[in-house]
Design a protein with these regions (language model features):
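Loop-rich non-cytosolic ectodomains and luminal regions
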Residues: 1-217
Length: 217
């Protein structure tokens, strides 16, 4: 994109794309860095910030560690019976090198499964599965991805994910992002209020989407 724009003497470049799951959102992706490089050459970069306001797609708060008496923070999303996504993506971002060490999933039927030591796809029964991945950016942002899938539509009801950090990490900032394959900026599966509310809440902080998270955007 950079050489294409330079060869054509571009003065302004407009991007109409916005993603909020599966990204570090800290300016370190290849596209974000390319935007910075083109901005440095004088090409104005215009990037949409997204439209996630009041969409229940973003959670922000404090992640406790496993020894915190307040317990883990529980995030949850709802799948409605009349609007079943085949895939729902959850991304949790923890800056400054902090990370999540405890992950426990509670399915709509109330059964629980530990995902703390998982890094691949797990069969959850009833056609549901979850794929777990972790990564770290060059700015030391840790990313946990959970991808829930069912070719016939995810089991309806409330899905809960309880999270905590390692012993001694204390309470640290985290954000959670949710998206699915049947909705866009709003609708579909969405976050429910996290618990306890003293640790985290649904809000609009951190709702700028990729690649508007580039340093120069």
């Amino acid at each position: 994109a950079q050489s294409w724009a330079t060869q054509r003497n571009a003065e302004v470049m407009l991007y109409e794309v916005g993603a909020w799951t599966g990204q570090f959102l800290d300016g370190t992706s290849a596209l974000e860095l390319t935007l910075d490089q083109m901005a440095d050459t004088g090409i104005v970069q215009v990037v949409c910030a997204g439209n996630l306001a009041n969409s229940n797609k973003v959670i922000q708060g404090l992640l406790p560690d496993v020894t915190d008496p307040i317990g883990p923070v529980t995030t949850s999303f709802k799948v409605s019976a009349g609007n079943l996504p085949k895939s729902t993506w959850l991304s949790y971002l923890i800056p400054n090198g902090n990370h999540i060490s405890f992950i426990e999933l509670t399915k709509p039927d109330g059964s629980t499964i530990s995902l703390s030591n998982s890094s691949s796809s797990i069969d959850l029964g009833n056609g549901d599965s979850v794929w777990i991945s972790r990564d770290t950016s060059t700015r030391n942002t840790n990313l946990l991805n959970l991808v829930f899938s069912n070719s016939n539509g995810l089991t309806p009801g409330t899905w809960e994910v309880a999270l905590a950090g390692p012993n001694g990490q204390g309470q640290v900032l985290f954000r959670g992002y949710e998206a699915d394959d049947i909705s866009s900026w709003a609708g579909g599966s969405h976050w429910l209020p996290p618990s306890p509310s003293s640790l985290a809440s649904i809000g609009d902080n951190g709702s700028v989407t990729w690649p508007a998270t580039a340093d120069s955007a």
